[in-house]
Amino acid sequence: MLRAAWRALSSVRAQAVTRAPVPALRGGSSASLLSARCGLQPPSLLRAARAYAAVQKPVQPKQDDEPPSSAFIKEYKDIIPNIEKVDDVVKRILSLEMASRKEKLKIKQEQLMNKIVENPEDSRTLEAQIIALTVRIRNYEEHMQKHRKDKAHKRHLLMSIDRRKKLLKILRQTNYDVFEKTCKELGVEYTLPPLHFQKVHRRFLAKKALCIRVYQEVQKLKKQKRALKAAAAAAKKEKNEGVPENPSNAVPEKTQVN
């Protein structure tokens, strides 16, 4: 976006340079642009600036659980005695202001663990894993606000969100009270997944219609086959009824008549 705005500005400057001078006004003095005389910007420049401001999204605000920058790192706090009495320059070096992003995320995770989990040292519980994923997701979101085309971080962000959804579902089924507390402290809203979701494609619809048509044709053929069998059985039964049951009894009668 910055590159596009810069190109628009450069094109406007090139047009202003190549534009022919305005003929002299009354009084013999050469006239400059009306916008330059009035102290206004050219309309194309204003349009480019407004378009850039409309496209640019606001930066995500900081979270409420953000640790203060003047706080000291825990490792240094335990090692150095009387850390409050050291020089201001040393305090700034040992504070979170000069700490790395990894240390800040670690401190943020520890704060949330102390607030939610009963045993902060146990990182294998479901709520502890959800806290770690939430801190990671917020870090990815802040990164994506600055670098929107970073596909690797976007993939990790979506994978972390799916993993957190799965853990929240399991925690909701096992311990609902802890689930409510975790969602409230983290500011996470859990939505129930639909019972059945399948994205409909044209290929799927065509295949389903073909399967239904084949099933109907098979049922029709089976019905015809059953009808033919019934007709053959009926014809056979009628034929058997027309023939005498004991033909050996009928032969002596004919001989006696002769």
Swiss-Prot record:
- What molecular functions are annotated in GO for this chain? structural constituent of ribosome
> Superkingdom of this entry's organism?
Eukaryota
Report any Pfam family annotated for this entry: Ribosomal_S15
Q: Which Gene Ontology cellular component terms are annotated?
A: mitochondrial inner membrane; mitochondrial ribosome; mitochondrial small ribosomal subunit; mitochondrion; nucleolus; nucleoplasm
Per UniProt, which keywords does this protein have?
A: Mitochondrion, Ribonucleoprotein, Ribosomal protein, Transit peptide
CDD domains in the record: Ribosomal_S15p_S13e
Query: Which compartments is it annotated to reside in?
Result: Mitochondrion matrix
Segment Disordered: which positions? 229-258
| Gene Ontology BP term (one) | mitochondrial translation
Q: Which SMART domains match?
A: Ribosomal_S15
- What SUPFAM superfamilies does the database record attribute to this sequence? S15/NS1 RNA-binding domain (SSF47060)
Q: What is its main location?
A: mitochondrion
Give the stretch annotated as transit peptide in the record, renumbered to this chain: 1-57
Quaternary structure per UniProt? Component of the mitochondrial ribosome small subunit (28S) which comprises a 12S rRNA and about 30 distinct proteins. Interacts with METTL17.
* Similarity remark: Belongs to the universal ribosomal protein uS15 family.
* Name under which the protein is recorded: Small ribosomal subunit protein uS15m
Q: Which organism is it from?
A: Mus musculus
**Taxonomy of the source species:** Eukaryota, Metazoa, Chordata, Craniata, Vertebrata
Q: Which gene encodes it?
A: Mrps15
